[in-house]
Design a protein with these regions (language model features):
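Phosphate-binding glycine-rich/basic clefts of nucleotide- and phosphate-handling proteins
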Residues: 13-97
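Short, surface-exposed connector motifs at secondary-structure boundaries
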Residues: 16-18, 120-125, 147-150
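Glycine-rich phosphate-binding loops at beta-strand->alpha-helix junctions
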Residues: 119-143
Length: 179
């Protein structure tokens, strides 16, 4: 049904990973949580595509200044008939709370294991989020609030890791050519 992905949290210095952890939490887990929430709270069965639309359009990891909503269609689990309900960003905040908490805990764990001299660099330069999960509204704010460290999303979060890896490979090739 869902392919398993991970969220990787790392402190990188001089092209190498100093401290890292990987948790079995990613975008698909957000979708699963929304499906479960809709079933439990509204007796509404929705598919993964609908859950992803909810996540993209009104999903929240942090309280929005104004509540946003969208109409969601699914199958009423009591009657078996199609049903449309209005879902709010506050509901997605609740649905995603457990998963976003796991991400924050993993970030906190990596920061605790970071050597003091690098911890100072992280405090100065901040935390950079990459990948699809970083596009969830409010994840930056949540991590920043819980860690006290400036948090931002990479310019192109969906390709940032791949581009960075490519640049590092080019760098290594250049180093080898110089030897």
């Amino acid at each position: 049904m869902y392919k398993r992905q991970t969220a990787d949290i790392a402190v990188i210095s001089l092209g190498g990973t100093v401290v890292s952890t990987s948790i079995k939490v990613a975008g698909d887990n957000f979708d699963e949580a929304i499906v479960r929430y809709m079933r439990k709270t509204h007796n509404l069965l929705i598919g993964e595509r609908t859950a992803e639309e909810i996540k993209i359009n009104i999903g929240s990891a942090y309280q929005r200044p104004e509540v946003v909503s969208m109409d969601v269609r699914g199958r009423n689990l009591v009657t078996g008939l199609p049903k449309t309900i209005t879902v709010t960003s506050d509901e997605t905040l609740e649905a995603l709370k457990e998963i976003t908490s796991q991400i924050v805990e993993a970030v906190h764990s990596v920061l605790e294991k970071t050597p003091p001299e690098l911890a100072a660099d992280v405090a100065d330069r901040g935390i950079v989020l990459t990948g699809g999960g970083s596009l969830l509204y409010g994840l930056e704010e949540l991590i920043e609030e819980k860690t006290g460290i400036n948090t931002m999303t990479a310019e192109d979060p969906m390709t940032a890791v791949a581009v960075g890896t490519g640049k590092f490979v080019e760098f290594l090739a250049g180093v080898r050519d110089d030897e």
